[in-house]
């Protein structure tokens, strides 16, 4: 059964401790959360208590590649304690996608971490923005990256893929066996800015058909820069709930 979550980066401007933010999420219909950087500085016991009292599951965690390389043991210990077995590299700078050589270097780094994580019971995924969809070879840099790392999952950000000029539904169909989490975000492709879900250029109906056909497990709401994060939380939860 499909489950819904929010990427906590969307709520980073709420000036409350993370457990209090989780309590706000618990007031919605969302089933879980996708952690961002704040969890690394929070009281883990308090976070676990908040997850439990709000019946929220850890959908995944965004963790930088440098953080995984520099403190692998610390990162895996934290997320293991949180019961989070899916780690997602949320961003690599555009220079990583400029050429076949730079993509190969990024793939080598991601592949090494993915192998270590698999041995320790974790899955590694990569979350796109727009820079990954530059032309490369017979496809895009994103295609080349995924072709180079067999154990790398693809957390597709539907809105950023569309803003980059890619076809998010075709991507979901092509990589269905690697997409367990999909980011439902929206953007204005002309200005390359995030907007409320349903107000940008994303064809929500087509994307919903694609993720359903691919049996995507988690629908994750994200808005990079909402004017009102609490209202955005409610809007995201209600919209994803309507997709069940």
How should these model regions be labeled?
Residues 10-12, 39, 64-67, 93-95, ...:
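Active-site-proximal loop/turn and secondary-structure-junction residues that shape catalytic pockets
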Residues 65-154, 230:
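Active-site acidic/histidine proton-transfer and metal-coordination neighborhood
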Residues 46-53, 105-116, 206-210:
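Catalytic-core regions built around general acid/base machinery
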Residues 32, 94-98, 192, 221:
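Short amphipathic alpha-helical segments at helix-loop
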Residues 1-5, 10-26, 78-84, 119-123, ...:
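Histidine-acidic metal/acid-base catalytic patches
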Residues 8-9, 33-35, 61-63, 100-101, ...:
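Short, contiguous strand/loop micro-motifs
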Residues 1-80:
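N-terminal pre-domain/capping segments
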């Amino acid at each position: 059964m499909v489950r819904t979550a929010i990427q906590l980066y969307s709520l980073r401007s709420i000036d409350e401790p993370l457990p209090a933010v989780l309590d706000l999420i618990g007031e919605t219909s969302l089933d879980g959360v996708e952690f961002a950087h704040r969890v690394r500085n929070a009281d883990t016991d308090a976070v676990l208590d908040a997850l439990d009292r709000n019946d929220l599951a850890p959908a995944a965690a965004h963790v930088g590649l440098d953080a995984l390389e520099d403190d692998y043991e610390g990162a895996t210990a934290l997320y293991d304690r949180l019961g989070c077995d899916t780690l997602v590299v949320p961003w690599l700078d555009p220079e990583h996608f400029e050429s076949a050589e730079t993509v190969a270097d990024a793939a080598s780094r991601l592949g090494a971490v993915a192998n270590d994580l698999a041995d320790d019971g974790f899955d590694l995924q990569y979350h796109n923005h727009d820079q990954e969809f530059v032309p490369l070879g017979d496809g895009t840099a994103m295609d080349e990256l995924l072709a180079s790392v067999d154990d790398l999952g693809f957390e597709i950000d539907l809105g950023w893929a569309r803003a980059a000029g890619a076809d998010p539904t075709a991507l979901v169909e092509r990589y269905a066996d690697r997409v367990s989490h999909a980011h439902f975000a929206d953007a204005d492709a002309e200005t390359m800015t995030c907007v409320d879900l349903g107000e940008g250029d994303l064809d929500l109906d087509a994307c919903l058909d694609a993720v359903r056909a691919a049996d995507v497990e988690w629908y994750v709401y994200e808005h990079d820069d909402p004017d009102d994060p609490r209202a955005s939380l409610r809007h995201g939860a209600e919209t994803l709930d309507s997709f069940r």
